[in-house]
Amino acid sequence: MTEPDEEAVALAHTLFQAARDGDTALLRSYLNAGAPATMTNAAGDSLLMLAAYHGHAEAVQLILKHGGEANSANDRGQTPLAGAAFKGYTDVARVLLDAGADPDAGSPSARAAAQMFARTQILDLLGQ
């Protein structure tokens, strides 16, 4: 069995943390250098999912610009839009919707999450 490349693992951890923190400068640097915007962690969470779930609209926009997939689901079937709806991040939801995110994709869908947690501003964006 091949051992994982320690430098690659460290870089991945750095990028995932940058997405969680909304560190757009660091993300931009690595994405411009060719880091894949679609990379996922062990739970299937993409950079986009982590940025969306933690409420970083600018980072979400940056990742989308570099090829992040608005409707990609993690291993639990959750999409970035569902994460934003669950947490009530209207600005993030707007960015994702503008990029073509499907409010009915995933399980639970963004629409279902917004209804479940009474996120009325998100529901308004989704057209209920």
Which residues does each predicted region cover?
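Start-of-repeat signature of ankyrin repeats
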Residues: 11, 44, 77, 107-110
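Intrinsically disordered, low-complexity regulatory segments in ankyrin-centric signaling systems
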Residues: 1-33, 42-45, 128
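Conserved ankyrin/ankyrin-like repeat signature
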Residues: 26, 58-59, 91-92, 121-122
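Ankyrin repeat domain, specifically the short helix-to-loop turn at the C-terminus of the second helix
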Residues: 28-36, 61-69, 94-102, 127-128
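Ankyrin repeat boundary signal
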Residues: 38-40, 70-73, 103-106
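Leucine-rich solenoid repeat scaffolds
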Residues: 93, 97, 102-128
